[in-house]
């Protein structure tokens, strides 16, 4: 039941408050005196949004468990920082790479330094769906990201904890986030 509630919360976040409520009202009105199945709920939510809800949710309903999202920072040619985000099935007992994939809504909060004035600023990147094994996310232009803890830069995956996954940060990103938490940034 915990996974179900968490997955519905995640879907609510993807669709937004008003669209989610409208979809639920549509579902309840359509099936108020009838039997319904999961696909009926997905269809009702899709009818009021531009999201293919069935495709998004199928892996969450049919896959056992949930993913671990691994994140690291690399630099492109030219010096632009890029977040590399990858997924695999989470297993507390052992390394598990069985090929399962989820469609994971990825949201990221980045604290970095504005190049124009050197001020520390926080930016939340637009949510993207990680549907493959991995993807690269460019940081916004005009920001300098440093792995030196003294620079007060960090990456926070899943702000608000609305998506259902665990996060494993690279050693460098973990140290930066720890420093940000200690400084209460």
What positions do the PLM features span?
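Non-catalytic accessory/interaction domains
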Residues: 3-10, 18-22, 29-185
